[in-house]
Amino acid sequence: MSPSESAKKNEKISEEATVESKAFSISVEKQTPDLDGLIVEELCMGNPNGKKAEPGKRVSVHYTGKLQGNGKIFDSTVGKSRYKFRLDAGKVIKGLDVGLNGMLVGGKRKLTIPPEMGYGAEGAGSIPPDSWLVFDVELLNVK
């Protein structure tokens, strides 16, 4: 390899590293850790003029729930009926109630939920005790 070819290759590697670094910093900026350990990643903001999920409002969502450790899907509404519930009424795990708050219709979030905000020391069905959960959620409607 000639010196000019080597320089071009190094320049390309440097450009790729810069792009990767920028993508990483954007990803990190979209993560919001909650005081209770909940991590909210904003994947898509939703309609800025749309309705916002707030406590007491009825929300409709599609979600896929996975175990963080192995990625095993334990529940999903994708390809099925949307899931509807009143936000902050205790009808879902705390991580979903807190993680959806403030979300705009059309938005998508990835919620990484600690056991204390999920199913805790008891677990549930195929979810082992003390499991961290990952939910990919899309907010479809707010009433």
Curated annotation (Swiss-Prot):
InterPro entries per record: PPIase_dom_sf, PPIase_FKBP_dom
Residues annotated as domain PPIase FKBP-type: 56-143
One GO MF term: peptidyl-prolyl cis-trans isomerase activity
EC number: 5.2.1.8
Name of a matching Pfam family: FKBP_C
Record key words, sorted: Isomerase, Rotamase
Domain of life of the source: Eukaryota
Catalytic activity: [protein]-peptidylproline (omega=180) = [protein]-peptidylproline (omega=0)
Keyword check for Isomerase: yes
Keyword Isomerase carried by entry: yes
Function: PPIases accelerate the folding of proteins. It catalyzes the cis-trans isomerization of proline imidic peptide bonds in oligopeptides.
Similarity comment: family membership: Belongs to the FKBP-type PPIase family.
Protein name: Peptidyl-prolyl cis-trans isomerase FKBP15-3
